A protein has these predicted regions:
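Aromatic- and carboxylate-lined catalytic core of secreted/periplasmic carbohydrate-active enzymes
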Residues: 92, 576-607
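Structural preference for beta-strand elements that scaffold enzyme active sites
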Residues: 182-186, 226-228, 286-290, 365-367, ...
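Conserved alpha/beta catalytic core and glycan-binding cleft of carbohydrate-active enzymes
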Residues: 383-548, 553, 561-565, 598-601, ...
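N-terminal structural segment of carbohydrate-active enzymes
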Residues: 2-265, 280, 467-506
Length: 617
């Protein structure tokens, strides 16, 4: 940050309703975002297309003071304000072209959130103020959104918040568990804790609740070495879902890649410190923290989405636009837009975010949602893309766990087995083969043997080990283990899409009756099938992943897409620990068997050589 003592007073005073202008120094173009150093705060924001950028300080009454950022280096607009301390709410206004046919959507009537914001406050109201087009006109013709109505979004949007970066990590150290010794447990912060009787009510659904000894003891009883958290970056609830009385429960709708989602904090004013405290608690028990991250798209959606940060900052830099009509967005993700990982600044944002979560928040790895999108240099998935090059060379990110969801919805997006050497992958072929085998598909026997022994056909040729295969049979997306053996068809009516959402081909078998039954033979068969699948998962070569609640037969009543169900349908029902105590005990035994016997977690593939008998030695 700047140490230049010559104070520069801004000329811009905005609407004049805020307090007197603070002292402003030139500051630095690095680091990006708002950085408090103990004496003041440096602000830095990127926009290549901007003609002017204003820093907007918001007081407790919602009044705004605008300060022109007159210093620009490498398209980064910056200033240092010695009077600004943690807790200060702020945003930016970007003046520049609003020309959608050219790919530009600057709108200074929008208070923009900091792309590097470490914390956020407030709510979105999804009124006209959030949108840079006439919503009534767009309802008539969605392709022609016209000129922006210039309705000020202050008071209708969230604000960024300056944080205190200092934290007592004590003697915290990363566990650094080797892959071949790792057992991953995929969990949802709220779903894991919302009904846990051992977690104090005021901590349920929070980072503090997840770090409660009652939860950690459960994980340790399962011999779990890493908890993989579904998205905890700050995300938005979709307007459509809110209108249906639903919510974006899963959280794959990020707009803040540096901020822990504040609705998971018991104290929203201290979300960063609470997240760090959670990580420290897990590390004390030898459990790694892996984040499910969504760097493939943002919450702003397509051309009809709100303008909350990236779109108004520099639309063409942050997003992939259609080559033949720059008004519209390429959509490899099924969400309305795709981040432009070809642009150097967007790549910088992704890498800066990853490094921040490792160095400042002490997380131990990442699972990349729809990772194939990050590898699309043009249209095809390219394992030599700039993103993979940067990860390979980065001295911090290359040393943590990197897990790819190796597909997206674009053409050629299914890339299981094709990621570079540092990466592990959610092995979708393992999932499909194990499901088919246990529902009685005889043709799968040969492939089942390959999956059981580490999927060498997918990973050995690229120099990877069996642990590159993240083995799973169920995950957040799809049936739970209980539902996999209880339903032939999805039952997603509660999602408000007439059961048209979610995967139709589930490779499931209901054992004779659709849904719940009192038939003792079917109940016994289902219990045996669940044990078969858990045993297969834990005794296969590779790195196993358990989906939260499967160890006690959690059900979603046949709903295989609970992305919008923030309710008892998706939360863990901890009473099942008693009801299904036999399955829980079995899971604990088989995970311990894996942990105790290295033969189930070999570091190398089987060589395929005949076993010599004693007479041949």
């Amino acid at each position: 940050v700047a140490s230049n003592p010559s104070a520069v007073q801004s000329d811009s005073v905005g609407n004049g309703t805020g307090p007197a202008l603070p002292t402003v120094w030139p500051g630095s173009n690095y680091p990006l975002g708002a950085t408090y150093d103990g004496g003041g705060t440096n602000f830095a924001v990127f926009s290549e297309i901007a003609e002017q950028v204003e820093l907007c300080l918001i007081d407790d009454d919602g009044n705004e003071t605008r300060i022109a950022l007159d210093e620009v280096d490498g398209y980064v607009w910056h200033a240092y304000l010695p009077a600004v301390t943690p807790g200060q709410r702020y945003g930016f206004r970007v003046h520049g072209p609003f020309d959608p046919p050219a790919g530009h959507r600057c709108d200074p009537s929008k208070l923009l959130l900091d792309p590097y914001g470490k914390a956020f406050d407030g709510e979105f109201d999804f009124s006209q103020a959030l949108f840079s087009y006439d919503m009534a006109a767009a309802a008539e013709n969605p392709s022609e959104t016209g000129t922006p109505p210039m309705v000020d979004s202050l008071g209708h949007t969230m604000t960024s918040v300056v944080i205190n970066p200092f934290f007592d990590w004590a003697s915290d150290r990363a566990p650094r568990t080797p892959y071949h010794e790792t057992i991953i447990y995929e969990a949802h912060v709220k779903g894991m804790t919302q009904t846990h009787p051992g977690v104090p009510e005021e901590l349920r659904g929070t980072y503090a609740g997840l770090a409660h000894p009652a939860v950690i003891d459960h994980l340790k009883s399962l011999n779990v070495t890493a908890i993989e958290l579904m998205p905890v970056h700050q995300f938005m609830h979709d307007q459509r879902l809110l209108e249906l009385g639903l919510r974006n429960y899963w959280g794959y709708n990020t707009f803040g890649f540096f901020a822990p989602h504040n609705q998971y904090a018991a104290n929203r004013q201290a979300s960063v410190a609470e997240f760090k405290t959670m990580v420290r608690a897990f590390h004390e028990e030898g459990i790694e923290v892996i984040l499910d991250v969504v760097y493939n798209h943002t919450a702003e959606g397509n051309h009809l989405g709100p303008t909350i940060n990236f779109r108004g900052m520099d639309n063409a830099a942050y997003y992939r636009l259609e080559d033949d009509d720059l008004r519209f967005y390429k959509d490899f993700t099924g969400t309305g837009n795709s981040l432009n990982a070809r642009h150097p600044h967007t790549l910088q944002l992704i890498m800066d975010s990853l490094r921040y979560w490792v160095t400042e928040m002490h997380v131990d790895g990442f699972r990349f949602d729809l990772a194939s999108t990050l590898a699309r240099e043009f249209y095809d998935v390219d394992r030599l893309s700039a993103f993979f090059d940067l990860v390979q060379q980065d001295p911090i990110i290359s040393q943590v766990k990197l897990i790819a969801e190796p597909w997206d919805v674009g053409e050629g997006g299914y890339q299981v087995g094709n990621f570079p050497g540092l990466w592990t992958e959610w092995n979708g072929k393992y999932r499909d083969t194990v499901r088919d085998y246990w529902r009685g598909e005889p043709a799968t026997l040969g492939e089942f043997a390959s999956r059981l022994t580490g999927s060498s056909d997918l990973y050995e040729a690229t120099g990877r080990r069996p642990s590159a295969s993240i083995n799973f049979v169920t995950a957040h997306d799809g049936f739970t283990l209980n539902d996999l053996v209880s339903y032939n068809e999805k039952h997603n009516e509660a999602n408000g899409e007439d059961n048209n959402d979610g995967e139709n081909y589930n490779r499931s078998w209901n054992c004779g009756v659709e849904g719940p039954t009192d038939d003792p033979d079917i109940v016994a068969l289902r219990a045996r099938q669940m044990r078969n699948i858990i045993a297969t998962l834990m005794l296969s070569q590779g790195t196993p992943m358990i989906s939260h609640g499967d160890e006690m037969a959690r059900t979603q009543q046949g709903n295989n897409n609970v992305y919008c169900q923030d309710s008892a349908l998706s939360w863990m029902d901890w009473s099942l620990a008693d009801k299904n105590a036999d399955l829980l005990a079995f899971t604990r035994r088989v995970t311990k068997l894996r942990a105790d016997h290295p033969v189930f977690r070999r570091r190398r593939f089987f060589a395929g050589q005949p076993i010599r008998t004693g007479d041949e030695v």
